[in-house]
Amino acid sequence: MPLVPRSLRGTNGMVDCQQGGLRYWRRMGGAEERMVGIGGGGRGVANTRDAIVAAARREFLSKGFHEASLRSIASEAGVTTGAIYGYFSSKEALLGAAVGNVGEGLCELCQRAFVEFESRSIEERSFSNMGAYEEHVQLRIIDYIYDHHDEFSLIAQHPVATRWERDLDCLAELEVRSTRAYGSELRAAGWDVRDPNPLVLEVIARQFFQALLQPIVRGVGREEARAFITEYGRFYYEGARALMEPQEPQGSAAGAVQASQGS
């Protein structure tokens, strides 16, 4: 973006700018300077930004981050290349906008699922019921990923540049914390449950959530991805069972059945 004459500088760090056929106010000084107002005709700032982001998403998906051309993005969005820098401080920032907050949204989905499960009685949260509930949640996760197919495709291609590692940390931490809390509650209710090594839990959890992107990477459809997560989730559940070795209290109905089967 060309230097702005002092005569056009407003108060509170605002600058009167004109670029790409638009006249707007720009707030200076941030890591990613923002368009905060529009004047003089033309389409609105939000619409222009959305057009740039949509064009960038298509360009990144088609050519990858390194080969993507800002000039092509600008041309498709109907703005100048310089206008892009009025909205985004770098190509990396533009990629981040193209992905949006879908990783954070996935963390929130899992957090809500954990809270929902924890709100149930301990009887409703037996290990077998937990497996059935997890299968339901995993299908919701796959649907969420496919509802944001393009964004997660970009994440799979560029995990570091899109903050996926941070989101993966969040997901793994949620899984480890909820698993250990669940084990503690079962023990308090009279179950015999091992407390797995936290590092083992973290590694397994990260691998599980990372694998959720594989259907996207391999180009399979939603229904095939749902079949994948159902089978993969069962494998994960049986692994958790092997680590925790849960034994229900002998006084419970399930425990009585288990005891009769063992006699």
Regions found by a protein language model. Name each.
Residues 120-127, 155-162, 189-193:
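Short linear capping/connector segments at secondary-structure termini
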